[in-house]
């Protein structure tokens, strides 16, 4: 809940800026000005960098005499109160305007974040540059030695942070109401319900998290470029990348790079610059769909019992954001040749732990012995296919995963994949196409419309066709929707 609140906060106040959301409340105390942070770039363009806080400050690793305390500039940042609600019935407000929805049943998830008045603390950069002149970093420091051994890691220094001024509360309220006699309702979080044979079931769940004063909710860093002799410079200009001199950049993967080649999307745009093409963004998505069919082929080739079991776990993940948030870093660790930590598993409930272990076993990973991860080439390919889908799901907007899960229950995922392939250059598909027949149903189309809207695609049903329009500044969400739909479709594909 804390991670969701901080992400929503930055989405509102610093959407295109350099601030980074704090995802774990326990990390707040570690975020001191001039603390050293490592930034690890990940494999696919949509994955956000991974930051790790070191138990050192910049002054701790300099060879010269004691480093002076930084000059800190403090200012009021903003008084922030955000309220976010997802409605299954009624009107959905999007950047496209109002999208009318007409669904059976109703569901509302409301998350309210009230951080109140926030304080910004930042280092005086000009003074920091003057204080750092002619100084060198001790690259023999044991902690930095471990950083140097890492793959694609960049050393950064924390130069600004946003903190709360008073105690605040983050609350999440969930109400689920399902029409059991017809359409499948939408659940955006796992809630235990007792359904009657043909009636309405309502269950409320309230969760409150208290945040103490002086809690850091966001921070900013500057990358360092470190030379072989320990001299360093601050990367102040956008586009200037940090790193270590003569350290060869390699794929941030532990497995055979050939396994990744099909997934690299070399021709796809970087996530930061949006989807663009001379033929238009819809054309890019259609090209991606053709490539994705090949990428997810290992799913379609699985024996039916294994495919069904893996599909069931993915559907459980779609309705369980806590499990999804743990599953991605576990896959990250396995890619790097690391075993999942006991602490990570301890964050999960017993049923979630069972699903996680079952997932890893189904994709060929062993948690026993000295070498974690898949062993043979076939298992590596299967694991990477699963990791590919997990990483895309993890970066989807809030509620999109649950909407995908609802579409799985309605068995319309193949219909949506076909819709993307069948779109004309101007974004129109004929509803007389037999495969698109489910979209004639008003309730089903409303759910699909909301799913596409969450991925910055406006979907409008005309008299005998469907028209799709991608937002001008949509960035990577349409591509992520394309990836997740194709992955789930491959898992549900019938064996020939």
UniProtKB/Swiss-Prot annotation:
Outcome after substituting residue 39 to A: Disrupts plasma membrane targeting and induction of necrotic activity
Assigned GO CC terms: cytoplasm; cytosol; membrane; plasma membrane
Post-translational modification: Cleavage at Asp-270 by CASP3 (mature and uncleaved precursor forms) or granzyme B (GZMB) relieves autoinhibition and is sufficient to initiate pyroptosis.
GO molecular function, one term: cardiolipin binding
One Pfam family matching this protein: Gasdermin_C
Effect recorded for residue 18 to V: In a colon adenocarcinoma sample; somatic mutation; reduced ability to induce pyroptosis
Region of interest (Membrane targeting domain), ranges: 1-56
Outcome of substituting residue 40 to A: No effect on plasma membrane targeting. No effect on induction of cytotoxivity. Disrupts plasma membrane targeting and induction of necrotic activity
Tissue distribution: Expressed in cochlea. Low level of expression in heart, brain, placenta, lung, liver, skeletal muscle, kidney and pancreas, with highest expression in placenta.
Effect upon mutating residue 44 to C: In a lung cancer adenocarcinoma sample; somatic mutation; reduced ability to induce pyroptosis
Matches recorded under InterPro entries: Gasdermin_pore, Gasdermin_PUB, GSDME
Regulation: (Microbial infection) Activated upon human coronavirus SARS-CoV-2 infection, leading to lung epithelial cell death. Activation takes place in response to (1) activation of NLRP1 and (2) inactivation of GSDMD following NLRP1 and GSDMD cleavage by the SARS-CoV-2 3C-like proteinase nsp5.
GO biological process: cellular response to tumor necrosis factor; cellular response to virus; inner ear auditory receptor cell differentiation; negative regulation of cell population proliferation; positive regulation of immune response to tumor cell; positive regulation of intrinsic apoptotic signaling pathway; positive regulation of MAPK cascade; programmed cell death
Annotated keywords: Cell membrane, Cytoplasm, Deafness, Isopeptide bond, Lipoprotein, Membrane, Necrosis, Non-syndromic deafness, Palmitate, Transmembrane, Transmembrane beta strand, Tumor suppressor, Ubl conjugation
Site (Cleavage): 270-271
Highest taxon above the source species: Eukaryota
Outcome recorded upon mutating residue 217 to N: In a lung cancer adenocarcinoma sample; somatic mutation; reduced ability to induce pyroptosis
Disorder this protein is connected to according to its UniProt record: Deafness, autosomal dominant, 5: A form of non-syndromic sensorineural hearing loss. Sensorineural deafness results from damage to the neural receptors of the inner ear, the nerve pathways to the brain, or the area of the brain that receives sound information.
Domain notes: Intramolecular interactions between N- and C-terminal domains may be important for autoinhibition in the absence of activation signal. The intrinsic pyroptosis-inducing activity is carried by the N-terminal domain, that is released upon cleavage by CASP3 or granzyme B (GZMB).
Name of the protein in its database record: Gasdermin-E
């Amino acid at each position: 809940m804390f991670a969701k609140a901080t992400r929503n906060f930055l989405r509102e106040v610093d959407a295109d800026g350099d601030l980074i959301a704090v995802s774990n409340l326990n990390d707040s105390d570690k975020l001191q000005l001039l603390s050293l942070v490592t930034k690890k770039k990940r494999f696919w363009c949509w994955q956000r960098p991974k930051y790790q806080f070191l138990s050192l400050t910049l002054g701790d690793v300099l060879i010269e005499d004691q480093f002076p305390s930084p000059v800190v500039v403090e200012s009021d940042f903003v008084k922030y109160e955000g309220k976010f609600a997802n409605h299954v019935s009624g009107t959905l407000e999007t950047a496209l305007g109002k999208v009318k929805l007409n669904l059976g049943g109703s569901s509302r998830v409301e998350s309210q974040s009230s951080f109140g008045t926030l304080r910004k603390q930042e280092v005086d950069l000009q003074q920091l540059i003057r204080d750092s002149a002619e100084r060198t970093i001790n690259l023999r420091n044991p902690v930095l030695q471990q950083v140097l051994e890492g793959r694609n890691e960049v050393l950064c220094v924390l130069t600004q942070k946003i903190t709360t001024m008073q105690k605040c509360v983050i609350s999440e309220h969930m109400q689920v109401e399902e029409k059991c006699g017809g359409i499948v309702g939408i659940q955006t979080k796992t809630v235990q319900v007792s359904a009657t044979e043909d009636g309405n079931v309502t269950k409320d769940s309230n969760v409150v998290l208290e945040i103490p004063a002086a809690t850091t909710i966001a921070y900013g860093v500057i990358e360092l470029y470190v030379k072989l002799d320990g001299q360093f410079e601050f990367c102040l200009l956008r586009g200037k990348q940090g790193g270590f001199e003569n350290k060869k950049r390699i794929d941030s993967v532990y497995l055979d790079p050939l396994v990744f080649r099909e997934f690299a999307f070399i021709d796809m745009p970087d996530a930061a610059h949006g989807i663009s093409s001379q033929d238009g963004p819809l054309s890019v998505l259609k090209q991606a769909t053709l490539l994705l069919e090949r990428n997810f082929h290992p799913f379609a080739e699985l024996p039916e019992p294994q495919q069904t079991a893996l599909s069931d776990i993915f559907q459980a993940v779609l309705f369980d954001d806590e499990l999804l948030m743990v599953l991605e870093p576990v896959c990250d660790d396995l890619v790097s040749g690391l075993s999942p930590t006991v602490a990570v598993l301890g964050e999960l409930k017993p049923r979630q732990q069972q699903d996680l272990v079952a997932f890893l076993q189904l994709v060929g990973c062993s948690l026993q012995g000295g070498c974690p991860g898949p062993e043979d080439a076939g298992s590596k390919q299967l694991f990477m296919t699963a990791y590919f889908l997990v990483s895309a799901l993890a970066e989807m907007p809030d509620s999109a995963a649950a909407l995908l899960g609802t579409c799985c229950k309605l068995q319309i995922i193949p219909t949506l994949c076909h819709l993307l392939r069948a779109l004309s250059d101007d974004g129109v598909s004929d509803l007389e196409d037999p495969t698109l027949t489910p979209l004639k149903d008003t309730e089903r189309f409303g759910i699909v419309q909301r799913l596409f809207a969450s991925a910055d695609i406006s979907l409008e049903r005309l008299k005998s066709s469907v028209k799709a329009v991608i937002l001008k500044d949509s960035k990577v969400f349409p591509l992520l929707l394309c990836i997740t739909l194709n992955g789930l479709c491959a898992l549900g594909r019938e064996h020939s």
